[in-house]
Amino acid sequence: MENLLAFFEGVGVENSNQPWQLDAAMAHQHLELLGKDETSSFLGAYKPNGSRKDLKPWTGPFSELETAQRKNQEGSGLYLCINNGTGLKDADIQQCVALWSEDDKRSKDEQLERWLARMPVPTFIVETGKSLHIYLVLIQPIAPALWKPIQSRLIDFVDGDPAVKSLSRVLRLAGSWYANKDNELTRLVTMRNVTGKRYDLEEIVSCLPEVEPKPQPVPSLKFPPKGGTYPSGTIRNIVDALRCIPPRVPGTGT
């Protein structure tokens, strides 16, 4: 484990851009590692919690990266919708290309060590500051109905943020700048641990605990509708059960 962690320390993507300029090459690599194209990829620019009220959210296709950069420079964070579709709502998602986790309850070293003890080596990681977004990219995209329960099981298993279970989840775009609540750009969102390895769905599922079956509710007997009767077998069972009750003995308080 220590050797693997040490190896990952040197695996990353360098940024050579000027301060506050979006690293377009890194943003495109984020897209390429997911196996996505610009036509099915959507971005969102959102202000940090507690920041300027006049900073309006923006959404658009990845092809409008220059517009997204301006929004970033104004103090909004930039996000990428990970799965493929026609927009940024769950109903818009048509194909799921990866599974992922985020965990900001632990240090970055603890996040990675915990992941590697449970799950395969990541395809890549996006480092946002205090948090790691860990990705497992699928060899073949899968349908949303198949993806949802597996993503939920993954998050539960690694104790990740339950908010990242949604189909249309957006995560920070690599190459963009992190904006604080004062709308100040403080650090570049970078990429690390880039292996490019992709996985069969079965390989990922094999790492997850089996789903425990839900207990089945015991049906309760209901009185028959007015004028109705119980089936004869049911009445016979009740009579047999009543015969097992000891008779009342007078004077014993029973």
State where each predicted segment sits.
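Short loop/turn segments at strand-loop or loop-helix junctions that form parts
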Residues: 44-45, 83, 103-104, 127-130
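Modules that initiate DNA replication and primer synthesis
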Residues: 2-6, 14, 50-52, 96-98, ...
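Short, polar loop/linker segments at the starts of domains and inter-domain junctions
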Residues: 51-64, 94, 115, 183-196, ...
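Short beta-strand
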Residues: 123-130, 161-166
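DNA replication initiation on ssDNA origins
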Residues: 1-97
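Alpha-helical scaffolding within the catalytic cores
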Residues: 84-87, 117-121
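Hydrophobic, Leu/Ile/Phe/Ala-enriched alpha-helical segments that form helix-helix packing faces
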Residues: 30-34, 65-73, 115-119, 151-161
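Basic/polar, cationic surfaces and motifs that engage anionic cell-wall
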Residues: 163-215
